[in-house]
């Protein structure tokens, strides 16, 4: 479980609830089933209209990764890659064959297989770079679906509020019913804004952020196997890979 997602969701909902309670309100008052049906499914379906079907499927397939902690550790991966580089340097590329059989990472297995086959640096790049680009495109489309749903949700909330007000104003002869209708109308607005900024939007941006980790790992692997094909010294190669994950924030 990605603890940051849990902290964000629980923390934001708790913060709003505490504020409402301090003002003498009831947070449960916004739990209006009709408003939910009008806003959230409509926003998600509108996003389906705006998103290519392949990416809609990807958005739901990769949804679990929003909440799951990805098993990606750049330092550990670099150490592993350098171990392979040392094997290549000392024993030759064919010595990697026995290691490849035990690798579960498909991209890494493909990359090392090309090294074993004697592929040149240019051939490796031509073969693996399109995979990285397509992976990036795949996750961009999947995350964009949730982001688009989040962008649509507040507007759909306003639509729901307008419908609610129309229904409420048709009951001028029944003040209690009209008041209830107006209250219900405003829950649609809250549902739309809350759904956007607490759930749908953050889900999309979280998936996008995790996709960056996947892409960065693939870039590290590509750089490593290109170095092996060139015959780079393991120490030199490790320095290059480490620089790829070293942030240097601007200090004014």
Task: Please place each PLM-identified region on the residue numbering.
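Large intracellular
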Residues: 4, 15-142, 214-252
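Membrane-entry signal-anchor segments at the cytosolic-membrane interface
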Residues: 1-7
């Amino acid at each position: 479980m990605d603890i940051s997602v849990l902290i964000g969701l629980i923390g934001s909902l708790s913060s709003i609830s505490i504020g409402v309670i301090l003002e003498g309100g009831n947070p449960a008052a916004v739990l209006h089933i009709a408003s939910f049906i009008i806003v959230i499914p409509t926003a998600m379906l509108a996003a389906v209209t705006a998103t290519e079907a392949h990416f809609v499927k990807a958005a739901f397939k990769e949804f679990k990764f929003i909440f799951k902690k990805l098993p990606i550790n750049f330092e550990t991966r670099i150490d592993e890659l350098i171990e392979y580089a040392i094997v290549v340097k000392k024993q030759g590329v064919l010595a990697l064959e026995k290691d490849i059989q035990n690798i579960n990472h498909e991209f890494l297995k493909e990359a090392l297989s090309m090294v074993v086959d004697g592929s040149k640096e240019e051939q490796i790049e031509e073969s693996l770079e399109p995979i990285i680009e397509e992976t990036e495109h795949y996750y961009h489309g999947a995350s964009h679906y949730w982001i688009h749903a989040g962008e649509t949700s507040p507007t759909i909330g306003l639509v729901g509020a307008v419908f609610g007000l129309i229904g409420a104003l048709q009951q001028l002869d029944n003040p209690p019913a009209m008041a209830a209708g107006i209250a219900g109308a405003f829950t649609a607005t809250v549902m739309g804004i809350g759904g956007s900024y607490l759930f749908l939007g953050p889900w999309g941006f979280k998936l996008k952020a995790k996709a960056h980790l996947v892409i960065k790992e693939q870039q590290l692997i590509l750089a490593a196997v290109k170095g092996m094909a060139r015959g780079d010294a393991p120490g030199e190669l490790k320095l290059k890979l480490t620089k790829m994950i070293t942030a240097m924030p601007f200090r004014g």
